[in-house]
Amino acid sequence: MSGSYPFIDIAALDSVREGFARGDAQLVLAHDLSTVLWVNGPGAKLFGYNRVEDLIEGQLDLPVATRRQIAAFSSENTSAPSAVAVRLGGGLRSELTHLHVSNIKLPDGVAALLVATQMPDNSAEAAISGLGDDSTHIALVDAVGKVVAASPRFALLDISASTLEDLIVEAGDATDRIVKRRIRTGSHSVPGAIARLTDTPALHLLCIVGDAPAQFQTAAEAVPLPDNAEAVLEEILPEQGDAPAQQAQKTHAEQPRPKTFAFDHDAPPARFIWKVGPDGTFSEISPDLAAVVGPNSADIVGRRFSDVANVFGFYTDGSIAALLLERDTWSGKRLLWPVEGTRLRVPVELAALPVYSRDREFLGFRGFGIVRPAEAEADPEEIGLALAGGIPQNRKPRKEPAETARMVGEDDVLALSEEVANDDQPAAVLPKPPLDITPTPGRRDSDKVISLLNSCAQEKVAADQAKFLKEKERATRPEGGLTKTERNAFREIAERLRKQGLANTRAESETPVSETSSIEPVEPTPPVKTRSEPIQPDETALLANLPVPVIIHSGDAIHYVNQALLDITGYESLDDIRSAGGVDVLFNSESDDGETRQSMVLRHADGSEEPVDAHLNAIAWRGGRALMLSLMPVTAADLPAPAELPAANDEEKQALEAHVEELKTILDTATDGVVLIDPEGRIRSMNHSASALFGYERDEAEGKFFSMLFAIESQRAAMDYLHGLSGNGVLSVLNDGREVIGREAKGGFIPLFMTIGKLPHTRGFCAVLRDITQWKRTEEELTNARKEAERASNQKTEFLARISHEIRTPLNAIIGFSELMADEKFGPIGNDRYRDYLRDINRSGNYVLALVNDLLDISKIEAGALDMQFEAVSLNDAIGEAIALMQPQANRERVIIRSSFQSNLPDIVADSRSIKQVALNLLSNAVRFTAPGGQVIVSTSYELNGDVVMRVRDTGIGMSKSEVEQALKPFRQINALEGRKAESAKDWRNEGTGLGLPLTKAMVEANRAQFAIDSNPGQGTVVEIVFPPTRVLAD
């Protein structure tokens, strides 16, 4: 697919990817409305094209009306999609289509237009229709790596399920939702990319670039032919009109030949990567393993771990197979891997960790291994020789998909290749001069090809024979039993001995290897000598003649010492050293004061000591592994000069001692206990306060473990605190102390707060312990007081709830019968006074019922048990309902209620029932305490700082500051009569229970709002309720 932008980059855009996954028709246009920058398959089909390539980077000829409608939207600076109804097609086949047009930003920031519409077919196959060709392959993959839909040639890529799972995980972790890298197809890799289109359910778009048949051609490294190979081939295969012969010549020249594997003993350890699936099948292994053990030995991809283990004889206890089933991290597992073409096997150490998908689905193990060729040992089963069998007889050469004719002389070439590959021993042949081929009538061209390959094979065998002779000569050298590293070590030691005069100068002469002009027939190749075979007597003689002390040991067991070590230590034999204590008696790494020495010290038989330098090497010994320790005496010139300490006079010493005593006195005076601890966790000393705190004498506690000072439940916490400070972790920086329980000598317990610090020079610790008994007692008292207050509040609430229930039942009966009698439904009462009495009974009953309800509400609010349901509440609507309820009462009192509500007032988060109750209480008080002809004004506003404010203003009698404070207290009324109203006026303040304002204020605060009241005698009252921005649902 061509285009200025990669197809997958635009498909992964946030404004495109979900519609692409749904199968919508999508088209990205430049602002000229003619150039198509990107289109998917349904989009190309919508505009009459079968393939995406036919439209991308092309010119789209839209109708004039459609272009005008889209241009009108493109001028708007908005990213929201706009619906446009256009007619697509022409003549009688035009259809009205609803398009959604939106402004988008391309990956490079260029603005463009996205035109999209839903299609009737929203299947996965429709989403990728029109995509993919011989060089481009498209697929939709779900969350578990299953291919939902794909282009026709996608299956030829042979991408494994594990590779798809890895791509899905990488795409989920990518910030831009796209991963571009080379993707493994079969045994090779090709460029590709994957994009995560949707999350729920997860769907991914996978794009592969490359010709599918070409991806299956083996790109092996070709074996170079001699310089005159082209000339020889031209003589063998002259230009003819026979097309099959020419094709065979070309195929033979291009066919790669595998390299011969040769095991390298002295190669360093190699690290390789491996991966197995959930069923234990190898899905990937890096070529580093094949470079050490051979390609056939490392060819395990597609095979189960248990099968490979059974064939190669890795293990017998099945421990690794059990670890693969546990799905946990493991490491340090050692096995022996056979080496191709040899009788050896090399140790391999494996480690692995489990791999999970984003949905916590187990995907298998990823791990690494370390193969150590230098530690190869003999394989009794000789599996490596079976792995070097060459090309099997029944194996057919793979044909390329485009080839139909068989190569000329192919059977003969394969037969010769098998003969050379299966030849385990070098043949006694001499190199021949370049082959001189003359045309021979009746001779097949394939015979000529065989002769050429035979010449090359003979030269290769001769080279292998020369290499074998060179190895044999090297095996006869005096130091042949030692590795290159060990020989270099001995030469370095000898050089140092010559410089110090401890050894005579010896000339090291090596007989040069003469080159033979001809190669004689040789005996069959002897078995390769492994490094695990025992050291030969000539090597022991070499060690015995060295003037350097040498010890060969394994752990504490000494296998061999030379005469130089016996001479320098004074022991008679190796048995004397073993009976004296072995390796431990020979070396002393600590000085008399317990400090670690900077150099190793060799202890003699008479107890004297001598500093030495040591050099350690791993060697093969008696069929196993051992360590060879070579020692070099350190002369006085090599030792560091002791530091000269300034002599302290008596006055400085006395001043220092006085300072120490002063510090001890200060510690003993402190009220906190101070305990010094050594690095092993034992008590070094403690001050008087600590001794009195725990009841131990100083000498009684010294030398005992620090944990003895704590109760059993606090010992673990105290020691964890101490161990955490011993390192350089977080505790050593963020040292905030611990609360622990101390244990007295007599068995009592003390609450303590402990802080531990590190001592700089002695590597010990200092613990400061403070008695927090009084703090704990005060904390317990406060906790009990709070619980008691909560219990009393709950009892009051429960009492009021019961009283309310008991009072409501008879009150409802009294109110109901009074209303029934006042209506005279069963006959006339006959007296107006009785009717007045009935009205009084009804009014008093309602008053008592309201009082009980207010008591219950205020008790619930104080206890925090009021059931409130916070939701979006329209404050204007709530106040409007309250005004409607109070309007009849205001009319009777001849009080005017006026309202001023702000339009577009945002909703608030509050309890709808309590907000209406607050509005009713405020309006009721305002109407009640306002004289006839007065006004009550209710208003709402939306402040600039985001507050929503409700105000209730009246022109009533007002209150002073002291009266306001008294009115806000429960069950308090303003009883003082002042002369600021006419004597004939009604004393409204003697009505009510004194719960109106306190209950209103409590409900306002329960709704997370602020309540304020401002009143002046004779001027009226203003009540203001403010809802903060956190309780306002602003747009």
From Swiss-Prot:
SUPFAM superfamilies: ATPase domain of HSP90 chaperone/DNA topoisomerase II/histidine kinase, Homodimeric domain of signal transducing histidine kinase, PYP-like sensor domain (PAS domain). Residues 614-1035 are annotated as: Interaction with DivK. Residues 500-533 are annotated as: Disordered. Transmembrane segments: none annotated. GO terms for molecular function: ATP binding; histidine phosphotransfer kinase activity; phosphorelay sensor kinase activity. Residues 1-613 are annotated as: Important for polar localization. GO terms for biological process: cell division; regulation of DNA-templated transcription. It is found in: Cytoplasm. The modification Phosphohistidine is found at residue 805. Keywords: ATP-binding, Cell cycle, Cell division, Cytoplasm, Kinase, Nucleotide-binding, Phosphoprotein, Transferase. Interacts with DivK. This is Cell-division control histidine kinase PdhS.
